[in-house]
Amino acid sequence: MKTDPLADLERLANLKEKIRNAHIEYMIAISVRKVAYSKIIQESESTSNEIITELALRNAQYELMETLNSEDFERHKAMFQAHNHNWAVRELTALRNCFAGALFVDLDNLIKGLSSIVNKQCAEANIGIEPVKHKQAGRAITNNVRLGAAIWAAGNNFRHFENWPGTPDVQPERTAIGSINILRDLLDFECFNWNVCGEVLALIAKGRSVEQLFEDFQQIGRDLCDVPLQTLDKHTERLLIQVKSEGLVNEEHQKMLAANSI
């Protein structure tokens, strides 16, 4: 499902706050979850099967509880409470990963829009994140993975992870190889058939706040704007000057990015 990630930049801030709450506090009210489910399904390019599966399992558990008489319920109450806690943790983990994935899809599309405007690849932005240090011999990482590349790989993972190979023995599709390699280097485990966006978000925010991700992302935007203005048309030149002086969030720039988003 094609989405317009730039229709409302305020949505990114709201989504960021939900991610932060789910990831750090690990608790979201049932009423908020219902909104979150519909929001993710509408705004992401993923089918969000993780969330749907966990929700179905929990609903089945509640239906079973309702069929028990009071004596059976009391006898199995402790067991149900334990199961309920486990399902809640699993559901919130899936929710956190899907929220993180939706964020990466938005950021990836926005970076692509910026890149198309200034005719410069986002991978050239001189911003990196420190990968996990590999323990295996011969797999030491010497260079940081660029933040733009990590966002791109995580966005692709969320969009298409269900179509990636289920085991390392199966050769992935050509379009997935680059993303899988980046995520493997970042996380130090095989990233096949799994949504790892929550782990990528935690890695990027390690030792810092999640807000730092947005500061780094805005720096990518500033770097992308740092190109010779004589190579741009007059309208884009005026927009970039305005962006540099006022920041990324202004109505005219949003429309320009939305028109050029991929």
Enumerate the predicted regions with their spans.
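Short acidic alpha-helical/loop segments enriched in Asp/Glu that coordinate divalent cations
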Residues: 114-134, 166-171
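Eukaryote-skewed repeat-based solenoidal scaffolds used as protein-protein interaction platforms
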Residues: 90-100, 104-118, 122, 126
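Acidic, Ser/Thr/Gly/Pro-rich intrinsically disordered interaction regions
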Residues: 1-57, 63-97, 134-262
